């Protein structure tokens, strides 16, 4: 990518719509716009106040392509930090396509995926963590996920990383004094000071790292698999949670023969709910495939919700499923609670904790609120819901923090063992670099390409 190129792209989704938006960014943006745009007043774009919507037409050799509104944002006070033109035309494939083709004919290049945001990063308007937050804002599935992403876009994570790197700089200053002036009698004081400050730094990194598990769920969703043998009420439960008849509900065992997936917002948690085929021995080829898919879904699940028929005693099939869930985060639902209870709860307690057993009636909508509260407490543990200002949601950030934490641990061990300060210096510089991966201070071009490749073309 050449930063001195002028680029353009369609910023809105393809298809029919009320408005289509095209974006131009770069040194020639204004010149190109002046060539193809004629305002209704006859004034040039520069004669208008910046950031003003100008009414006019896009023309090609005096032929009007479309009636538009145009905005000019002069760099560096724009999204990319460059001169930016945004054209609002009528939505629809033809108008937008013809305007883009006209723009590209003026020595303008089609933007690569995420190139507008990449330029914002390269021009210093935002750092890398803020750039990545743009995608999270777009893809947020709940209010809390959106709030977390918006806070990161506004710089909450950037600020924290700067604070941590400032602490590293301070500790490094002590180390470098000790290395440069070994004859000075400051060794004992320096070791003690460094141990205290490095331990504090290590705790700060760990505290931030610990938000990553819940953050990943907010960003990607909690994969929740509903399991149980046939006809215990799994599909009724799914319909109760979704509030619609998404799954087939009958008295015939094996009705759900495939894996049904839905996203639902549970108290701010994006749940990717997977309703599986009932697990049982069967000669039906199609149902057998569904059963195998159900078993496979166990391995990748973040949470298992097992449904049991409370009106019947535990069967061998029930126990076989419970055995598979021993090491999984599991909630057991005793369904059909409106009927006489026959199930033996004490046997279930061999496999799950008491507070993970909830009595419900999926058909009567009883116990659903308690299930939602339980999921909320398992995911958030109160931390994110009460403070969504600083949460690590990106796996790349989590990996960098993990490496920074290990280096902080190594530095602390070196100090506790009174090893030469040169060893400590190496560990501290590693911490500095790993934290820099997050905000983009220490990052390679290949990594940047990989990150922005996940963006859409017009962003």
From Swiss-Prot:
UniProt KW tRNA processing keyword: yes
Source superkingdom: Bacteria
Any single biological process term in GO: tRNA wobble uridine modification
GO molecular function, one term: metal ion binding
GO cellular component, one term: cytosol
Cofactor(s) it depends on: K(+)
Locations listed in the record: Cytoplasm
Residues annotated to bind GTP: 231-236, 250-256, 275-278
Cleaved signal peptide residues: none
Cofactor note (record): Binds 1 potassium ion per subunit.
Top EC class for this record: hydrolase
Binding site for K(+): 231, 250, 252, 255
Enzyme Commission numbers on file: 3.6.-.-
Sites where the protein binds Mg(2+): 235, 256
Keyword annotations of the record: Cytoplasm, GTP-binding, Hydrolase, Magnesium, Metal-binding, Nucleotide-binding, Potassium, tRNA processing
InterPro entries linked to this entry: G_TrmE, GTP-bd, GTP-bd_TrmE_N, GTPase_MnmE, MnmE_dom2, MnmE_helical, P-loop_NTPase, Small_GTP-bd
Annotated residues for binding of (6S)-5-formyl-5,6,7,8-tetrahydrofolate: 23, 86, 125, 459
Function as written in the Swiss-Prot or TrEMBL entry: Exhibits a very high intrinsic GTPase hydrolysis rate. Involved in the addition of a carboxymethylaminomethyl (cmnm) group at the wobble position (U34) of certain tRNAs, forming tRNA-cmnm(5)s(2)U34.
Quaternary structure, from the entry: Homodimer. Heterotetramer of two MnmE and two MnmG subunits.
Family the entry assigns: Belongs to the TRAFAC class TrmE-Era-EngA-EngB-Septin-like GTPase superfamily. TrmE GTPase family.
Name of the protein in its database record: tRNA modification GTPase MnmE
Species the sequence originates in: Clostridioides difficile (strain 630) (Peptoclostridium difficile)
Gene label: mnmE
């Amino acid at each position: 990518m050449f930063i001195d190129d002028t680029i353009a792209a369609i910023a809105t989704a393809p298809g029919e719509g009320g408005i289509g938006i095209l974006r131009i960014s770069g040194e020639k943006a204004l010149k190109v716009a002046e060539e193809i745009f004629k305002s209704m007043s006859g004034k040039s774009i520069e004669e208008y106040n910046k950031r003003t919507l100008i009414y006019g037409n896009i023309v090609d050799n005096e032929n009007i392509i479309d009636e538009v509104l145009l905005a000019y944002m002069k760099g560096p006070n724009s999204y990319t930090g460059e001169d930016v033109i945004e054209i609002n035309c009528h939505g629809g494939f033809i108008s937008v396509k013809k305007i883009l083709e006209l723009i590209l004919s003026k020595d303008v290049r089609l933007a690569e995926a995420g190139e507008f945001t990449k330029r914002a990063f390269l021009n210093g308007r935002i750092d890398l963590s803020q750039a990545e937050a743009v995608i999270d804002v777009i893809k947020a599935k709940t209010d809390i996920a959106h709030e977390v992403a918006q806070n990161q876009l506004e710089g909450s994570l950037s600020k924290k990383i700067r604070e941590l790197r400032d602490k590293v700089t301070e500790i490094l200053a002590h180390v470098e004094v000790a290395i440069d002036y070994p004859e000075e009698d400051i060794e004992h004081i320096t070791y003690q000071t460094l141990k205290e400050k490095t331990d504090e730094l290590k705790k700060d990194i760990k505290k931030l790292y610990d938000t990553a598990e819940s953050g990943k769920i907010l960003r990607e969703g909690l994969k929740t698999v509903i399991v149980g043998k046939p006809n215990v009420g799994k599909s009724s439960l799914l319909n109760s949670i979704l509030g619609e008849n998404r799954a087939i509900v009958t008295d015939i065992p094996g009705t759900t023969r495939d894996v049904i997936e839905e996203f639902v917002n549970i108290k701010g948690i994006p749940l990717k709910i997977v309703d599986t085929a009932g697990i049982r021995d069967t000669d039906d080829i199609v149902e057998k495939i569904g059963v195998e898919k159900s078993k496979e879904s166990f391995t990748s699940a973040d949470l298992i919700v097992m449904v049991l028929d409370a009106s019947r005693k535990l069967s061998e099939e029930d126990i076989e499923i419970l055995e598979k869930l021993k090491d999984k985060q599991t909630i057991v639902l005793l369904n059909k609670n409106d009927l006489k209870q026959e199930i033996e709860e004490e046997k279930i307690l061999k496999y799950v904790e008491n507070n993970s057993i909830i009595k419900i009636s999926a058909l009567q909508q009883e116990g659903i609120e308690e299930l939602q509260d339980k999921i909320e407490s398992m995911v958030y543990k109160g931390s994110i819901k009460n403070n969504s200002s600083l949460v690590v949601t990106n796996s790349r950030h989590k990996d960098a923090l993990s490496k920074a934490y290990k280096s902080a641990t190594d530095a602390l061990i070196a100090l506790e063992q009174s090893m030469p300060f040169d060893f400590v210096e190496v560990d501290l510089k590693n911490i500095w670099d790993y934290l820099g991966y997050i905000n983009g201070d220490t990052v390679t071009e290949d990594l940047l390409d990989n990150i922005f490749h996940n963006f859409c073309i017009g962003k």
